[in-house]
Amino acid sequence: EQQKYLNAKKYVKLFLVADYIMYLKYGRNLTAVRTRMYDIVNVITPIYHRMNIHVALVGLEIWSNTDKIIVQSSADVTLDLFAKWRATDLLSRKSHDNAQLLTGINFNGPTAGLGYLGGICNTMYSAGIVQDHSKIHDLVAIAIAHEMGHNLGMDHDKDTCTCGTRPCIMAGVLSCEASFLFSDCSQKDHQEFLIKNMPQCILKKPLKTDVVSPAVCGNYFVEVGEECDCGSPRTCRDPCCDAATCKLRQGAQCAEGLCCDQCRFKGAGTECRAAKDECDMADVCTGRSTECTDRFQRNGQPCKNNNGYCYNGKCPIMADQCIALFGPGATVSQDACFQFNREGNHYGYCRKEQNTKIACEPQDVKCGRLYCFPNSPENKNPCNIYYSPNDEDKGMVLPGTKCADGKACSNGQCVDVT
């Protein structure tokens, strides 16, 4: 499972914000600020490509009227304010994995940027801030790649770390010379972070239409107007793709995808993905495209020895959810614990309507907060919950979970399985 996760291609859907001082600095010229941001992304993309990560710019916002937070020279205060704004305002408007603020302000001391360590995919902490500290956009791009590196679990390099050139991207001190490589330590940090946390948001590939920056032929990502993209003509090894034009070579039907083989579509009915479990189905090619469309068993089909019902290709049961939250020995609490969900307080509720927590009706108590018994020597409390004010949804019973015979959770209610 871990190896499969590590091998999977990762995608960071990036949102960039430029503050009001940036807008003034570039002569109140929106096009100039945008071009600066696009140039920066075009430097970041190949840096992360070497780490099996594609960085796609899915959003860009320029604060051309006034700042939406109080940007100040204290970097840690500004980072906290930016992260809170992202969590409470930006995320509800535009889905993305990571946000970085580019500011024209001078931070105190030698700081050129700041980012939360290991924050990727977290509602509250997948963010960084960077000072537009140099006219050379390569150096600013490397500073953003550095803060994103922190978000992706990389710490500062120690003296023993190397990337063949000195310094590397995660060096603790900003360098005047551009370095486009991560050190051996950074790669190890990142790998260990991925294995430990398995962040899910970066597995989702963005749509071509999600990308807001102009298409760049040679960045390994097929964008609007391209048929394929295998990198530069110098590095491309794909016989199906013309690297200079990002168009398919003559006679080729496709260049990549689970239903593409030697530049041709695989035949209709060819299996392209085996069934993962009893709620999944084997996926097959259509013979007309490279897509391997995900199919699964109908919702409501019994699974896991009748302990659950299939829901969107998975079999969510409370026992597994308790193990995921509290460790391998955890079990589901007794029914009496679930009565706390009738209180409608800050953690015990069934759903939220316009940010108001709605208490569970008696028949719905098993569709609110999940109660578990950790079964560990240090915790003998029979009614435990997982609750984090930064991510209140984590620790709720998952949609589709069996809550009674013939019933499953939907929007905080225990309803008939149809």
Curated annotation (Swiss-Prot):
<keyword id="KW-0964">Secreted</keyword>
<feature type="disulfide bond">
    <location>
        <begin position="367"/>
        <end position="409"/>
    </location>
</feature>
<feature type="binding site">
    <location>
        <position position="294"/>
    </location>
    <ligand>
        <name>Ca(2+) 2</name>
    </ligand>
</feature>
<keyword id="KW-1206">Fibrinogenolytic toxin</keyword>
<feature type="binding site">
    <location>
        <position position="216"/>
    </location>
    <ligand>
        <name>Ca(2+) 1</name>
    </ligand>
</feature>
<keyword id="KW-0800">Toxin</keyword>
<feature type="binding site">
    <location>
        <position position="229"/>
    </location>
    <ligand>
        <name>Ca(2+) 1</name>
    </ligand>
</feature>
<keyword id="KW-0325">Glycoprotein</keyword>
<feature type="disulfide bond">
    <location>
        <begin position="279"/>
        <end position="310"/>
    </location>
</feature>
<dbReference type="Pfam" id="PF01421">
    <property type="entry name" value="Reprolysin"/>
</dbReference>
<feature type="disulfide bond">
    <location>
        <begin position="161"/>
        <end position="185"/>
    </location>
</feature>
<keyword id="KW-1217">Cell adhesion impairing toxin</keyword>
<dbReference type="InterPro" id="IPR036436">
    <property type="entry name" value="Disintegrin_dom_sf"/>
</dbReference>
<dbReference type="InterPro" id="IPR034027">
    <property type="entry name" value="Reprolysin_adamalysin"/>
</dbReference>
<protein>
    <recommendedName>
        <fullName>Zinc metalloproteinase-disintegrin-like crotastatin</fullName>
        <ecNumber>3.4.24.-</ecNumber>
    </recommendedName>
</protein>
<dbReference type="InterPro" id="IPR024079">
    <property type="entry name" value="MetalloPept_cat_dom_sf"/>
</dbReference>
<feature type="disulfide bond">
    <location>
        <begin position="350"/>
        <end position="360"/>
    </location>
</feature>
<feature type="binding site">
    <location>
        <position position="281"/>
    </location>
    <ligand>
        <name>Ca(2+) 2</name>
    </ligand>
</feature>
<feature type="disulfide bond">
    <location>
        <begin position="403"/>
        <end position="414"/>
    </location>
</feature>
<keyword id="KW-1199">Hemostasis impairing toxin</keyword>
<dbReference type="GO" id="GO:0005886">
    <property type="term" value="C:plasma membrane"/>
</dbReference>
<keyword id="KW-0645">Protease</keyword>
<dbReference type="GO" id="GO:0006915">
    <property type="term" value="P:apoptotic process"/>
</dbReference>
<feature type="binding site">
    <location>
        <position position="146"/>
    </location>
    <ligand>
        <name>Zn(2+)</name>
    </ligand>
</feature>
<dbReference type="GO" id="GO:0004222">
    <property type="term" value="F:metalloendopeptidase activity"/>
</dbReference>
<feature type="binding site">
    <location>
        <position position="295"/>
    </location>
    <ligand>
        <name>Ca(2+) 2</name>
    </ligand>
</feature>
<dbReference type="GO" id="GO:0006508">
    <property type="term" value="P:proteolysis"/>
</dbReference>
<feature type="disulfide bond">
    <location>
        <begin position="240"/>
        <end position="263"/>
    </location>
</feature>
<feature type="disulfide bond">
    <location>
        <begin position="228"/>
        <end position="241"/>
    </location>
</feature>
<feature type="disulfide bond">
    <location>
        <begin position="163"/>
        <end position="168"/>
    </location>
</feature>
<feature type="disulfide bond">
    <location>
        <begin position="121"/>
        <end position="201"/>
    </location>
</feature>
<comment type="function">
    <text>Snake venom zinc metalloprotease that induces apoptosis in vascular endothelial cells (VEC), without degrading the extracellular matrix (it cannot cleave collagen) or inhibiting adhesion of VEC. Has also fibrinogenolytic and hemorrhagic activities.</text>
</comment>
<dbReference type="InterPro" id="IPR001762">
    <property type="entry name" value="Disintegrin_dom"/>
</dbReference>
<feature type="domain" description="Disintegrin">
    <location>
        <begin position="214"/>
        <end position="299"/>
    </location>
</feature>
<feature type="disulfide bond">
    <location>
        <begin position="259"/>
        <end position="285"/>
    </location>
</feature>
<keyword id="KW-1015">Disulfide bond</keyword>
<keyword id="KW-0482">Metalloprotease</keyword>
<feature type="binding site">
    <location>
        <position position="226"/>
    </location>
    <ligand>
        <name>Ca(2+) 1</name>
    </ligand>
</feature>
<feature type="binding site">
    <location>
        <position position="156"/>
    </location>
    <ligand>
        <name>Zn(2+)</name>
    </ligand>
</feature>
<feature type="disulfide bond">
    <location>
        <begin position="322"/>
        <end position="372"/>
    </location>
</feature>
<dbReference type="InterPro" id="IPR006586">
    <property type="entry name" value="ADAM_Cys-rich"/>
</dbReference>
<dbReference type="InterPro" id="IPR001590">
    <property type="entry name" value="Peptidase_M12B"/>
</dbReference>
